[in-house]
């Protein structure tokens, strides 16, 4: 092997082993501050070398350290709804030439402890096991990890069978979990690592009126879904009448 060939092998190996934190921002629901907060939280809570990549339709205000690319088009039939399926574009066989391990994080997660293990935990594909219906295989795609380009058939199958898929699966995470399970590569994060703010942190009424939300033991990432977002957790409020929310100091300390 020549010196140049050896350099090429080393370059390829390095890129195949690099860690990429992926996020996605479209529309106006979440501003650039969510991307920047997420980047800062990852920096504070990992010792692993990583590159942050945001797939977005708006780059204004995003930290220059975050590499931005357009959200790959789903290329669905004209008139088909795309918004609910956008995350699947992270599985394009060639995502802007990116290589390595990809850890996808929703913009509204809050990191509360070291996440090195999310890069090193064994498994070809890891996702949160749905908390509400654990008897199903469906994962929650707020946090998932995979090798970029490792599922080259996922998007072609999605496009070819879209009408059938939209009837069978409620959302992208249901299709994603099913497809990876068909490949015999579906696995889940340890249960304590990713917790729901709604299900695992909020107090039940009447305790919610005088006891603040709790941080679950062993939790590394707190996932927000439903009507409550991180600003609601920091300031209090945001819940429905039957879900009273006091301010959470530990979320305030983490979300910046």
Model regions: which residues?
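N-terminal anchoring/stem segment of glycosyltransferases
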Residues: 2-78, 95-98, 148
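Extracellular/periplasmic catalytic domains that process cell-envelope and extracellular macromolecules
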Residues: 14-15, 136-138, 213-217
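Structural motif
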Residues: 18-20, 101-103, 220
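Short, charged, surface-exposed secondary-structure boundary motifs
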Residues: 31-34, 77-83, 134-143
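Short, polar loop motifs at secondary-structure junctions
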Residues: 53-61, 111-116, 192, 227-228
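GT-A fold catalytic core of metal-dependent nucleotide-sugar glycosyltransferases
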Residues: 60-63, 67-74, 86-138, 145-146
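Conserved catalytic core of nucleotide-sugar-dependent glycosyltransferases
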Residues: 115-179
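Catalytic core and acceptor-binding pocket of nucleotide-sugar-dependent glycosyltransferases
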Residues: 152-256
């Amino acid at each position: 092997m020549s010196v140049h060939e050896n350099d090429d092998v080393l370059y390829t190996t390095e890129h195949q082993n690099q860690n990429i934190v992926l996020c996605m921002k479209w529309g106006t629901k979440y501003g650039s501050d969510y991307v920047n907060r997420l980047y800062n939280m990852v920096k504070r809570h990992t010792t692993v070398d990583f590159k942050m990549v945001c797939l977005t339709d708006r780059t204004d205000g995003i930290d220059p350290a975050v590499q931005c690319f357009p959200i790959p088009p789903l290329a669905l039939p004209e008139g088909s709804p795309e918004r609910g399926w956008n995350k699947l574009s992270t599985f394009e066989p060639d995502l802007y030439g990116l290589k390595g391990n990809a850890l996808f994080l929703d913009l509204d997660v809050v990191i509360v402890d070291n996440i090195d293990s999310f890069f090193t935990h064994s498994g070809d594909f890891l996702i949160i096991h749905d908390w509400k219906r654990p008897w199903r295989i469906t994962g929650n795609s707020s946090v998932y990890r995979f090798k970029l380009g490792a599922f080259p058939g996922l998007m072609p199958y999605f496009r070819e069978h879209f009408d059938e898929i939209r009837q069978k699966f409620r959302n992208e995470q249901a299709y994603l979990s099913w497809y990876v399970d068909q490949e015999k590569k579906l696995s889940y994060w340890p249960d304590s690592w990713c917790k729901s703010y709604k299900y695992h942190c909020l107090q039940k009424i009447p305790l919610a009126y005088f006891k603040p939300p709790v941080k679950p033991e062993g939790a590394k990432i707190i996932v927000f879904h439903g009507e409550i977002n991180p600003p609601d957790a920091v300031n209090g409020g945001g819940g429905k009448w039957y879900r009273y929310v006091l301010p959470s100091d530990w979320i305030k300390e983490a979300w910046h």
